[in-house]
């Protein structure tokens, strides 16, 4: 179940980033035409993908922690403990998924021809 959730999250990030590249084609073309290195464009979109996944991981951790506390409140005999190592590992996995999912759209954005990109607007 967890693997399927990670896969769906990764596909969601790829989709969101692909749409972002398509919507910002003109901006990307302008940046490249003004001399921005392709590496900068790549890092811009990779950073956005990582930020999205880190935020999603953090919100998921908050939701999980809140649900665990609600269960502990309803069933006090049930011990609820979340080790910090699990929290850090979960956030690291979320960031890694975001980084992996952002590579394709970021490479596509970095490889855009500035003339064609500016022509689309």
Tell me the role of every PLM-derived stretch:
Residues 1-20, 25-72, 86-101, 105:
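Transmembrane alpha-helical interface segments in multi-pass membrane proteins
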Residues 107-121:
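Short cytosolic juxtamembrane segments of multi-pass membrane proteins
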């Amino acid at each position: 179940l967890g693997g399927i959730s990670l896969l769906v999250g990764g596909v969601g990030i790829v989709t969101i980033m692909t749409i972002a590249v398509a919507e910002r084609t003109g901006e990307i073309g302008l940046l490249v035409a003004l001399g921005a290195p392709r590496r900068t464009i790549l890092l811009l979109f990779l950073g956005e993908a990582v930020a999205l996944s880190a935020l999603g991981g953090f919100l998921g951790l908050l939701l999980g922690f809140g649900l665990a506390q609600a269960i502990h409140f309803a069933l006090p005999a049930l011990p609820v403990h979340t080790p910090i190592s699990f929290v850090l590992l979960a956030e690291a996995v979320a960031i890694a998924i975001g980084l992996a999912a952002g590579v394709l759209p970021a490479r596509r954005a970095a490889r855009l021809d500035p003339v064609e990109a500016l022509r689309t607007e």
